Amino acid sequence: MSNKFLGTWKLVSSEHFDDYMKALGVGLANRKLGNLAKPTVIISKKGDYITIRTESAFKNTEISFKLGQEFDETTADNRKAKSIVTLERGSLKQVQKWDGKETAIRRTLLDGRMVVECIMKGVVCTRIYEKV
């Protein structure tokens, strides 16, 4: 993983996030809160473990993992998922599986920004973060 991912990132733009949350099955009240949130993402590494902490007024979440090893994750919308993060062509690709469903989250560095694509049932959400 490139050390360029490491650091603190602030959301600057978001497209189709409400549609993505609908595809995940998130209820209206939580979607409204999610749409208002402007999260900060902190990515750090200690040894073989990568930690991604997401902080917002809505909720804070944190995952720690080794690349290529499945782990249990409780998502911001309280889904209990089995997740795995791999390095794919310079991007961090995360796959969450729960209740027979699956979503993919791809984090890519582009022009000094972190572009996060979230894909579920044909819905593609793009969220762009700038380093703080």
Swiss-Prot record:
It is found in: Cytoplasm. It comes from the Eukaryota. Forms a beta-barrel structure that accommodates hydrophobic ligands in its interior. InterPro entries: Calycin (IPR012674), Fatty_acid-bd (IPR000463), ILBP (IPR031259), Lipocln_cytosolic_FA-bd_dom (IPR000566), Myelin_P2 (IPR031256). May play a role in lipid transport protein in Schwann cells. May bind cholesterol. One of its GO terms (biological process) is membrane organization. The modification N-acetylserine is found at S2. (9Z)-octadecenoate binds at R107, R127, I128, Y129. Keywords: Acetylation, Cytoplasm, Lipid-binding, Transport. GO terms for molecular function: cholesterol binding; fatty acid binding. This is Myelin P2 protein. Hexadecanoate binds at R107, R127, I128, Y129. It comes from Mus musculus (Mouse).
